[in-house]
Regions:
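P-loop NTPase catalytic phosphate-binding loop
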Residues: 1-105, 111-114, 121-181, 190
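Cell-envelope/extracellular anchoring and linker segments
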Residues: 105-106, 242
Length: 246
């Protein structure tokens, strides 16, 4: 089984008519952060990536923490792996417990598990100082120890800031910045390649750092959004189906 998921197309090669896929090797690059301002296509890309995980990684399980709590993930309402707004702390704890169970041997499986947290920064800002620090420590635990147990983290938010990640920034080995990027974001997330990056890109295009390789990326358009939602739904519902024996 391949450990790779397609992220998008190489924009530089696409300009010459060559459709070359940019792939995420999640065994080598276990954790991801996606950022971009409103209108950048960040949510579209995040949904598409979750759908590919649900469809192409057998037995994958996804926990979605949707702090923004608008309509983008409302189709997941009622699923055991879906947490909204002030319920996001429970979703974070569920991911932590998944990793602990695998460490203890209570969960012997090594199937792909992902916690996707939408608007992590806004979530932290909603907490008091003590609770925010505890949440950052839980995230650091997942980022530092998750790889060996096939436990992964995907953070999606409008902008990046070191204050929201403690010392765990270097654990994000897949970084995707979409649309127009600020100079500060480029410096923080793409510092080794800052002189190569055009920070001004249209909606649906961006920069992808996959391990130590940098790409200009185009996110392909999908004409069947219901298929995307069905694929995400299947992965978020998997814990419930396993309990039911299906």
């Amino acid at each position: 089984m391949s450990n790779r998921v397609t992220l998008g197309l190489d924009a530089d090669l696409l300009a010459f008519g060559v459709r070359s896929k940019i792939r995420w090797d999640y065994a080598r690059c276990p954790h991801a952060v996606v950022f971009g301002a409103t209108g950048s296509g960040k949510t579209y890309f995040t949904r598409l990536l979750l759908a590919k995980i649900g469809k192409f990684i057998p037995d994958s399980e996804i926990v979605v923490c949707d702090f923004k709590s608008d309509d983008d993930f409302s189709f997941l309402s009622g699923c055991p792996g879906f947490f909204r707004f002030d319920g996001c702390s429970e979703g974070l704890e569920a991911a932590v417990e998944k990793l602990k169970a695998r460490q203890r041997g209570a969960d012997a499986s090594r199937s792909f598990f992902l916690m996707m947290f939408d608007e992590w920064a806004a979530y932290l800002n909603s907490l008091d100082k003590k609770a925010a620090e505890a949440a950052k420590q839980k995230l650091s635990y997942l980022l530092m120890l998750g790889r060996s147990f096939n436990v992964h983290v995907l953070i999606s938010q409008q902008r990046v800031d070191a204050a929201y990640f403690n010392t765990a920034r270097d654990n994000f080995s897949l970084v995707v910045g979409l649309g127009r990027l600020s100079r500060e974001s480029v410096q923080m997330m793409f510092s080794d390649f800052r002189d190569e990056i055009d920070p001004v890109k249209p909606r649906g295009q961006g920069t992808a750092l996959v391990g130590d390789r940098i790409f200009n990326m185009v996110v392909p358009q999908v004409t069947t959004p219901l298929t995307v939602e069905e694929a995400i739904l299947s992965a978020v519902q998997r814990p419930e189906r396993r309990r039911d024996g299906n």
